[in-house]
Amino acid sequence: MAVYNYDVVVLGSGPAGEGAAMNAAKAGRKVAMVDSRRQVGGNCTHLGTIPSKALRHSVKQIIQFNTNPMFRAIGEPRWFSFPDVLKNAEMVISKQVASRTSYYARNRVDVFFGTGSFADETSVNVVCSNGVVEKLVANQIIIATGSRPYRPADIDFSHKRIYDSDTILSLGHTPRKLIIYGAGVIGCEYASIFSGLGVLVELVDNRDQLLSFLDSEISQALSYHFSNNNVMVRHNEEYERVEGLDNGVILHLKSGKKIKADALLWCNGRTGNTDKLGLENIGLKANGRGQIEVDENYRTSVSNVYGAGDVIGWPSLASAAYDQGRSAAGSMVDNGSWRYVNDVPTGIYTIPEISSIGKNEHELTQAKVPYEVGKAFFKGMARAQISGERVGMLKILFHRETLEVLGVHCFGDQASEIVHIGQAIMSQPGEANTMKYFVNTTFNYPTMAEAYRVAAYDGLNRLF
């Protein structure tokens, strides 16, 4: 067994692992990266964020073509199969892998491909694909192994018509009807993708409202948009069993209802990738969801072992994971880059997008904060009229006495970009966080950014 010595070993090359490895390497540490795939990038690059967003982009382009009157004048609507649009995602994945591979090379991070597990608190055994075992010894270790879809034991995921959010990328045809069980972020995103391809979607939600953590007006806007685009949302439903057939799949619900479709996509929960890490060898134990507990410095109960990304739970976003990994390494090497990552904007890549940061109306009402609301509807914005993306709104919540911006919520095209203007103002200290910024700032015209000015005037005009 070959033995290699490092200052830091990072388990997992997704966003959290990458952020940790880069920060530790730039602090002068000798770093090794371990990943179970033969390519870097983690689930984010190969099965999650990148392929699903590339799929979404392709589908959005198809929708734009098929709904634009100018294109309708010169030809019939065009429809593409799921495998067709998946080809674009595969090209993006290869480009991402190449970019990330170069990052590790430039920063002299050694990458080991194989299954890593703890031998003890300072060493990791890596079983390579050829069966060779290599031992990495390090002063500090970061767990950033990510998560995978939760699979109930009573569902046969080996059936050719039953998929989860990882295996759906192997779907070789376009179903006419699809059941999506689980209406969280991933379920809603895939509902948008498949409905955009003309698939009838049954979206089964075990709650009474879509994405209940969102501002209720934004959630309602998504529900309304779904109802107009071949998505049937069924709230307050739980599965009894899933019956796989040769010609389809039947979802039996506890309410007594039955739904039949060509395929079923399971999107109900995720579990941390900790079961193969040998945590018992270092005295660590994952919770029931496979996640490990860390403190505000991202340190586990084992003093030299840290955790970051989906494997530690909330918020389970690629954007947050990268910052958590970077901060975990910052805490480890003490280079001043640590921060506790909690000011995270939400980005949901449905069609249209949703993004938000800060408090929503329910939270402010519960806290008895005297707030006011300013809105800008995209249908009145020149840029939206030019682009044809007229669905959506920007909503700003602010303190009616101090004018402090308390929350920004956006539904519509480019929402995940638009929200960052509000985020920048909300992060300003003291009186610099104010609605006055939006009315006293000249925005390029026409842009979607000027929605902030429109919403600010709308809100300030409500004051008396």
Curated annotation (Swiss-Prot):
Signal peptide: none annotated. InterPro entries: Class-I_Pyr_Nuc-Dis_Oxidored (IPR050151), FAD/NAD-bd_sf (IPR036188), FAD/NAD-binding_dom (IPR023753), FAD/NAD-linked_Rdtase_dimer_sf (IPR016156), Pyr_nuc-diS_OxRdtase (IPR001100), Pyr_nucl-diS_OxRdtase_dimer (IPR004099), STH_gammaproteobact (IPR022962). GO terms for molecular function: dihydrolipoyl dehydrogenase (NADH) activity; flavin adenine dinucleotide binding; NAD(P)+ transhydrogenase (Si-specific) activity. One of its GO terms (cellular component) is cytosol. Pfam families: Pyr_redox_2, Pyr_redox_dim. Keywords: Cytoplasm, FAD, Flavoprotein, NAD, NADP, Oxidoreductase. Its cofactor is FAD. It is an enzyme of class 1 (oxidoreductase). It is found in: Cytoplasm. Its EC number is 1.6.1.1. FAD binds at D35, S36, R37, R38, Q39, V40, G41, G42, N43, C44. Binds 1 FAD per subunit. GO terms for biological process: 2-oxoglutarate metabolic process; NADP metabolic process. The keyword Kinase does not apply. The keyword Methyltransferase does not apply. It catalyses: NAD(+) + NADPH = NADH + NADP(+). Conversion of NADPH, generated by peripheral catabolic pathways, to NADH, which can enter the respiratory chain for energy generation. Belongs to the class-I pyridine nucleotide-disulfide oxidoreductase family. This is Soluble pyridine nucleotide transhydrogenase. The gene is sthA.
